[in-house]
From Swiss-Prot:
Family matches, as Pfam families: UxaC
EC number: 5.3.1.12
Gene3D superfamilies (UniProt xref): Metal-dependent hydrolases, uronate isomerase, domain 2, chain A
Enzyme class: isomerase
Protein name per its UniProtKB record: Uronate isomerase
Source organism of the structure: Thermotoga petrophila (strain ATCC BAA-488 / DSM 13995 / JCM 10881 / RKU-1)
Family: Belongs to the metallo-dependent hydrolases superfamily. Uronate isomerase family.
Encoding gene, per UniProt annotation: uxaC
Involved pathway(s): Carbohydrate metabolism; pentose and glucuronate interconversion
Length: 451
């Protein structure tokens, strides 16, 4: 039965295990919600605004079905966009987006209809009636979200995180420090960003010393607002020793507008990653490395819509083990590190790294891997090579608030099914299985990030 009680639960033990975890609170150490939207607490106007307006998963699949861009990110009305989505939605079967949006509809709106061209108008009208009472804060409480960590630039004032402590009840909203723009010396706008950091923190960032001082001040500012983790997007990690004099010369050259060589770009990024690691060591923050996303791969999308518009891909030609060796050994036992990989063929590398370094954790199946298929493969491999018990928990990695409910439910069901299968095969007693799914779903990530 579609989305029935046994949805994704493939054995009797799985049903018992899911009942142990389905109502646990949600802790999410990595997402892309905007704290401003939560604080302002304005209800959405329509179902497209909820499900499609910020979701590049939806955009990509609509493009795959031949929908014109004007019905995705263009000038058409939200209703026209929703009707266009519903018309092709049956083609999404097998992709997790099909299940996530139906879960949102069934669990949050209590509208148990299958999305199609025939039901689109009814769903539009029914959700329109219910949305005025479904504010962001109420939904977070209804989904039992206990803690969420947004992703924030070091230049941020964090004013809405500060306000959240005063006006948001029952949910803790914390920032995450994401200094990618500080490190990406090869990206357009780097100098302007460095100057902005200087203005924000009262430092002369034309010098390396001033820039690092501004970053330290930002780090402290985030700490004062409850931050517990940093986050770094690395296409291919390449972190090694770089002398400070070398980094200083590169910084000054880049700031003056001179073109850098590829070696200089690599050296600067390696130097900065080591600085970020030392900052995190001081505050005992978790360092999250998201590895393997080749961003803005489709030029036409990037030129017209900018980043995060559905033009990113996965690539497997990466030297992860070699690129992380220096960083991991320098911070061996000194820094909690979570490794997320986009290509599933990299899982053996990070799983065996975690097995070798007790302070390293494998992150949740991420982005293109957060389907039932991807999760099952990820969990089974991790259990067989490292410790499933040590998985760094589930992250929504989403810009869409309703994802907290649907994505977490899907993960907990798949986890229960994987562990339940071990019970059915006689590999694990049911008592230990209950403790395992509870730890992975809630206790473990809460202790790792917030303990």
């Amino acid at each position: 039965m579609f989305l029935g009680e046994d949805y994704l639960l493939t054995n009797r033990a799985a049903v018992r295990l899911f009942n142990e975890v389905k109502d646990l609170p949600i802790v999410d150490p990595h997402n892309h919600l905007d704290a401003k939207d939560i604080v302002e607490n304005k209800p959405w106007s329509d179902i497209w605004e909820v499900e499609g307006a910020t979701d590049h998963y939806v955009w990509e699949l609509m493009r795959r079905c031949g929908i014109s861009e004007e019905y995705i990110t263009g000038s058409r009305s939200n209703k026209e966009k929703w009707l266009a989505l519903a018309k092709v939605f049956p083609r999404f079967v097998g992709n997790p987006t099909y299940e996530w949006i139906h879960l949102d509809l069934w669990r949050r709106f209590n509208i148990k209809k299958v999305i199609s061209e025939e039901t689109a108008e009814e769903i539009w009208e029914e959700t329109k009636k219910k949305l005025p009472e479904m504010t962001p804060q109420k939904l977070l409480r209804d989904m039992k979200v206990e803690i969420l960590c947004t992703t924030d630039d070091p230049v941020s004032t964090l004013e809405h995180h500060r306000k959240a402590k005063e006006v948001v009840e029952g949910v803790t909203i914390l920032p995450t420090w994401r200094p990618d723009r500080a490190m990406n010396v090869d990206k357009e706008g780097w100098k302007e960003y460095v100057e902005k950091m200087g203005e924000r923190y009262g430092e002369d960032t034309s010098t390396l010393e001033g820039f690092l001082s501004a970053l330290w001040k930002s780090h402290e500012h985030f700490k004062e607002h409850g931050c517990v983790a940093s986050d770094h997007a690395l296409l291919e990690p390449s972190i090694y020793y770089v002398d400070e004099n070398r980094a200083r010369a590169i910084h000054e050259k880049a700031f003056s507008g001179e073109k850098l060589t590829q070696d200089e770009i690599n050296d600067y990024k390696a130097f900065m990653m080591m600085q970020f690691g030392r900052m995190n060591q001081e505050t005992n923050w978790v360092t999250q490395l998201h590895i393997g996303a080749l961003r803005d791969y489709r030029d036409s999308l990037f030129k017209t819509l900018g980043p995060d518009s559905g033009g990113d891909i996965s690539t497997n030609f990466l030297r992860i083990a070699e690129g992380l060796r220096y960083f991991l050994n320098e911070f061996d036992g000194k820094l909690k590190i979570v490794l997320y990989v986009l290509d599933p063929t990299h899982l053996p590398t990070v799983a065996t790294i975690a097995r070798a370094f007790p302070n390293v954790y494998v992150g949740a199946p991420w982005w293109f891997n957060d389907s039932p298929f991807g999760m099952e493969m990820h969990l089974k491999y991790l259990a067989s090579v490292d410790l499933l018990y040590n998985l760094a928990g589930m992250v929504t990695d989403s810009r869409k608030l309703l994802s907290f409910g649907s994505r977490t439910e899907m993960f907990r069901r798949v986890l229960s099914s994987v562990v339940g299968e071990m019970v059915e095969r006689g590999q694990i007693p049911i008592k230990e299985a209950r403790e395992l799914v509870k730890h992975v779903s809630y206790d473990g990530p809460k202790a790792l990030f917030f303990g």
